[in-house]
Amino acid sequence: MLTTSSSRGQRPFGARVKAFVALTKPRIIELLLITTVPVMFLAEQGVPSLRLVLLTCLGGYLSAGGANALNMYIDRDIDALMERTSQRPLVTGMVSPRECLAFGITLAVVSTLLFGLTVNWLSAWLSLGALLFYVVVYTMILKRRTSQNIVWGGIAGCLPVLIGWSSVTDSMSWAPVILFLVMFFWTPPHYWPLSMKVKDDYARVGVPMLPVVASNKVVARQIVIYSWVMVGVSLLLTPLGYTGWFYTLVALLAGGFWLWEAHGLQNRAKAEVTGGKLKEMRLFHWSITYVSILFVAVAVDPFLR
């Protein structure tokens, strides 16, 4: 239940600050920056300017934070009905819808100008494009209409890879495109296991995530397909000359363990295992570890060639 503006004004200042920070979803942004900074090392083939790294990270944080705030503004009706999102600032009344909207728009404008004036305008437009894609295409159009929402909506989360490259080179190349595709094929098998866990929440609010409209067997099969394509694409960097033995070894080992987990989930789904024994969150947690390991290898590889 939303509180009145007068009661919001009585909230401690520190709690209000924490609420606005929560609107940006810092933990998700950490994952986005994990993919941005290593690509800067790859583009530089060494250590990029510390100033450039800091400005790119700040711009990326503000842009993604603005997108997340606008997402919460649009989804405030269903967030109030889902257990997983019931403590978000708009639901608890710590922040009003008007404040959230103004905050999100402000971050979008500031991040675009920061990128354009201190990094380059290619990065600025990519950043703005990611924000608009997430807010308009995913949140407003796809999320409540199709079970493929996270597949195409996930494009927004892939663009930080391109931004990392463009911030250093002010251009594009095949290397960031390949890593963009890695993230594109990573997103569904990353998010679907979580959706399997909380599918009742999504069903309650009418969001047709794939696990809501399809059986666990179907979802697990899709996870395996996307996983194989993701691992295969991740290995394209080396034959094209962008990475060497270290990245290749890490990609093979990390990818192999991912496939082991994905097939394990599929086998449990085929056996019609349900509840905690399905262990779908094992793959979700590993997916975060996988992308962290893979992109650390992207950053380290130039120093070992």
Curated annotation (Swiss-Prot):
GO terms for cellular component: plasma membrane. GO terms for molecular function: protoheme IX farnesyltransferase activity. It is found in: Cell membrane. Keywords: Cell membrane, Heme biosynthesis, Membrane, Transferase, Transmembrane, Transmembrane helix. It is a multi-pass membrane protein. It holds the Pfam family UbiA. Its main location: membrane. One of its GO terms (biological process) is heme O biosynthetic process. The chain crosses the membrane at residues 28-48, 52-72, 101-121, 122-142, 149-169, 174-194, 218-238, 240-260, 283-303. Its EC number is 2.5.1.141. Pathway: Porphyrin-containing compound metabolism; heme O biosynthesis; heme O from protoheme: step 1/1. It catalyses: heme b + (2E,6E)-farnesyl diphosphate + H2O = Fe(II)-heme o + diphosphate. Belongs to the UbiA prenyltransferase family. Protoheme IX farnesyltransferase subfamily. Carbon 2 of the heme B porphyrin ring is defined according to the Fischer nomenclature. Converts heme B (protoheme IX) to heme O by substitution of the vinyl group on carbon 2 of heme B porphyrin ring with a hydroxyethyl farnesyl side group. This is Protoheme IX farnesyltransferase.
